[in-house]
A protein has these predicted regions:
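Catalytic cores of RNA-modifying enzymes
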Residues: 1-166
Length: 166
């Protein structure tokens, strides 16, 4: 299962908190809880998604909290106890600005397990002397250890986008 694979890639979920950005209907949220997350704080701005997540909140025995907000407006370093792990299938149009803002406070986070459009992921993880190397890879490598995990084909999503994710 793809969502469980992503959750396992995030490391030891049993300590600290997992911050999930844009949980939508909760596929990754369920996987985080099934993989033993002690606490998941999910930030969602879409009221319909929040309503869809309510059954999961009820079943999670206090391990899931939903914050109705735009994640760009929240200081994630104020949420829960460290260690903080950010795990997200980021909206592609705001993924890069979010990452850059979090990297400014990288010491407040244990890890980031993030999905981007493959071309953006390649720019984030690019090595010097490659065509993709630039401002984004410099910022990411300066503040974090960066490595791509796996490709996710368009057919893994409904509706299927025209791009591969990583």
């Amino acid at each position: 299962n793809l969502t469980r694979r992503i959750a396992r890639a995030a490391g030891n979920l049993g300590e600290g908190i997992c911050i999930e950005i844009g949980p939508g209907p909760g596929g990754l949220t369920r996987a985080l809880l099934l993989e033993g997350a002690r606490k998941v704080i999910a930030i969602e701005r879409d009221r319909r998604s929040i309503e869809a997540l309510q059954d999961l909140v009820d079943a999670a025995d206090g391990r899931l909290e939903i914050i109705e907000a735009d994640a760009m407006d929240i200081d994630l370093t104020t949420l829960g106890d460290a260690p903080r792990r950010v795990i997200a299938n980021l909206p592609y149009n705001v993924g890069t600005p979010m990452l850059l803002s979090w990297l400014k406070r990288a010491e407040a986070f244990e890890s980031f397990t993030l999905m981007f459009q493959k071309e953006v992921a390649e720019r984030i993880s690019a090595s010097p002397s490659t065509p993709q190397y630039g401002r984004l890879s410099i910022a990411a490598r300066w503040r974090a250890e960066v490595f791509p995990l796996f490709d996710i084909p368009p057919r893994a999503f409904t509706p299927a986008p025209k791009i591969t994710s990583q």
